[in-house]
Amino acid sequence: MATSDHSLLGYALLGLIRLRQPCSGYDLRRFFAGGPMATFSDSPGSIYPALKRLERSGMVSCTLDETARVRRRALYRLSSKGKNSLRRWLAKPIKADDVLRRMPELFLRFSFLEDCLGPGACKSFLESLVLSLQAHITMLQDHLQSNQAKMSRSARLALRSGIMGYESQAAWARMALDEYRKSNAN
């Protein structure tokens, strides 16, 4: 993808098209509106321009469904270029600041990971996520320990809330990793 097309919406569309192809823009909009990806805008002003950018960049192909009753529907399929781009994005290593700045992206990547790259990739991803989260939690706890005497009560409580949120995500990642490890053992 060109730099301007490296948006989470673009990758979400690539992942969904891969799983549901062929699908129309309307099908994708409905999925965004009523499902777990509701954080993305389901407006035609977001989805259709993003689909056009993906088509222009060769990530998806579009054909017209002549069998539609009322009007022809554009049906999207992932191209080999789109599959490769999606795979590269999914396989990116987790960087230290990803847990601080890009948790929604990490969870979006994880949601497509098994279908695209298999359970082994999920296990590796979760192992890396646990390590990254634990490093970040340790850094925050050290900061709290070193600075709590200088911090206001509200600042300490806000920081503790952040730590607890990361601890919750780390606990989830360990639970998910255990599930993958158990499935490998069977």
What kind of region is each of these model predictions?
Residues M37, D65, A91, D115-G118, ...:
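Short, flexible helix-adjacent loops and helix caps
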Residues G120-N186:
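Mid-protein regulatory/catalytic core that forms ligand/cofactor-binding pockets
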Residues R20-C23, G35, D42, L113, ...:
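Residue-level signal for short amphipathic helical patches enriched in basic/charged
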Residues S4, D98-R102, A149-R153:
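Structural motif
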Residues Y11-G15, L108, S124, L157:
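Positions in alpha-helical segments
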Residues R88-L131, A135:
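Amphipathic alpha-helical dimerization/coiled-coil segments
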Residues M1-V99:
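Basic helix-turn-helix/winged-helix DNA-binding cores
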